[in-house]
Amino acid sequence: MAVKIRLRRMGAHKAPFYRVVVADSRSPRDGRFIEEIGYYNPIAKPEAEVKIDAEKAAKWLGNGAQPTDIVKKLFNQAGIK
């Protein structure tokens, strides 16, 4: 089972926010997931709001989960390597 760390879209029409989730790569974007590890709100003022549980992220990265490109950027922003 290939596991990805990716964004799950939530929110209203034209007002999205995203949850950072660990999911099987074969499941749909907004479908079933294994664990939620944070959230990302690009609409927040004055700048985008990012909150990620560093311990959970490190655990999943250590277990071989592959983050998507956007999630990699969010991890760098949050100080997670």
From Swiss-Prot:
Family as reported in the entry's similarity comment: Belongs to the bacterial ribosomal protein bS16 family.
Any one Pfam family match given in the protein's UniProt record, by short name: Ribosomal_S16
Keywords from the UniProt entry: Ribonucleoprotein, Ribosomal protein
Entry-linked NCBIfam families: S16
Protein's UniProt keywords contain Ribosomal protein: yes
InterPro entries: Ribosomal_bS16, Ribosomal_bS16_dom_sf
Gene Ontology CC terms, in alphabetical order: cytoplasm; small ribosomal subunit
Entry protein name: Small ribosomal subunit protein bS16
UniProt entry tagged with the keyword Ribosomal protein: yes
Domain of life: Bacteria
GO molecular function: structural constituent of ribosome
GO process terms (BP): translation
Coiled coil: none
